[in-house]
Amino acid sequence: MHLKNVIWQALNTRQTHFAECCDTARRFMSEVTSLCGLAEPNDDGYAGLACLAGPGGTAAIFLDRPYARRAGWEYVVGAPLLQMICENGHGSRRMKSQAKILELGDKDSPEMLELTAQTKPGPFGPRTHELGYYVGIRDNEKLVAMAGERLKVPGFTEVSAVCTHPDHLGKGYAAALMTEVMRAIRERGETPFLHVRADNTRAIAIYERLGFRMAWEGHFAVLRSTAVVGEARPA
């Protein structure tokens, strides 16, 4: 199984309070994340997306197939993407780590932005942490690793923003933090899932050890609007 059109589904179900809408396109508020969803990747969908992005604005989307060039859009970056689901695995117990795991919140947002800018786990904005439960590890008071929740659809929550400062790799921080986030998800009776670049073999190996299995192969694309359109209409 896989979660079909998961960004669109999230913005039409459990995360409507973060949504901005224009016809058959949805996006998260810009300070939350740049992720956007289309009912269908057709002319109407991209017209709605242009409405949301605004002139020169960017949008990050998930697609079943590689992005095909369209008028009014500049392709910025993209890559093959995997969706992985953990229907079983180690979400109910913490992986071994000597580090103390701390819950993160509003006051930690500047450091979270700094860490994600260094490690590039995916789109992360000043309000991304509002999407769910975020945890981190500090070394000498500095945030060096983190993980949290992002997309939410009925019965499922995504583990996201899993990242570790390069100076602290190999200490088991990612697995420990993911396991804590997965524990919280399972305590709510939900199933963890995630997305990862298909070429990130180091991360995929960690996720497989935690019990995640591949559910979908697709693509992500970051696009920049070159059209002149109206402003988005809030949901």
Which residues fall in each region the model found?
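Short amphipathic alpha-helix that is part of the acyltransferase structural core
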Residues: 1-4, 89-122, 233-235
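Acyl-donor-binding surface of acyltransferase catalytic domains
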Residues: 1-95
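Conserved acetyl-CoA-binding loop-helix of GNAT-fold acetyltransferases
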Residues: 44-49, 170-187, 204-209
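Conserved beta-strand-loop-alpha-helix junction that forms the acyl-donor binding cleft
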Residues: 61-66, 184, 193-204, 220-231
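Conserved active-site alpha-helix within GNAT-family acetyltransferase domains
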Residues: 67-73, 175, 198-216
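Conserved catalytic-core motifs of GNAT/GCN5-like acyltransferases
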Residues: 76-86, 195, 213-228
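A conserved beta-strand-loop-helix scaffold within acyl/acetyltransferase catalytic domains
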Residues: 123-165
